[in-house]
């Protein structure tokens, strides 16, 4: 089934996968934002010596981290569906634009997995720090992971910006 325009076609499978992928991406952004807020709250609990609340929040964040990973995996499946439909998109300019957009989003998902893994490591280190402080070596690991998380966030934001520009170009082409 195709959505037809004069000299233009976009497979319904592509459009459906794009919509599902968009919803997943929004959920990932929301969950990741919540994790950043929790990190601030954990730091506050640390300053207040409230280890039980910090540990509780860290446990919740480790579960949220798994949820983000699962959502990113589902997003990659939607990107695969979109990629399979690309050869059937007309005109060629739209096909080329969306191929670039999908490639950018695949790169973004790859960075997202790395970002999420750094977060997981950070929460695990903080869990050790609060539950077994005698095993906690130093704050260098925390500082390193926060720096890596920030690097990945910058890369993800840049890829997202490029993706949005490219997908907007695709939309302009097919909606002319």
Residue ranges and their predicted role:
Residues 3-79, 105-176:
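C-terminal amphipathic alpha-helix
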Residues 94-105:
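Acidic/His metal-coordination segments adjacent to aromatic residues that form catalytic metal sites
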């Amino acid at each position: 089934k195709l959505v037809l325009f004069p000299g233009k076609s976009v497979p319904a499978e592509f459009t459906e996968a794009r919509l599902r992928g968009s919803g997943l991406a929004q959920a990932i952004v929301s969950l990741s934002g919540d994790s950043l807020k929790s990190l601030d709250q954990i730091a506050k609990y640390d300053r207040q010596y409230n280890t039980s609340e910090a540990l509780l929040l860290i446990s919740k964040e480790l579960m949220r981290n798994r949820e983000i990973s699962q959502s990113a995996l589902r997003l990659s499946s939607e990107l695969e569906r979109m990629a399979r439909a690309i050869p059937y998109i007309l005109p060629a300019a739209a096909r080329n634009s969306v191929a670039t957009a999908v490639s950018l989003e695949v790169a973004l998902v790859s960075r997202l997995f790395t970002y999420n893994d750094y977060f997981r490591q950070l929460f695990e280190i903080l869990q050790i720090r609060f539950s077994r402080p005698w095993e906690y070596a130093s704050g260098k690991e925390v500082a390193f992971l926060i720096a890596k998380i920030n690097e990945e966030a910058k890369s993800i934001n840049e890829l997202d910006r490029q993706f949005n520009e490219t997908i907007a170009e695709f939309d302009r082409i097919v909606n002319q």
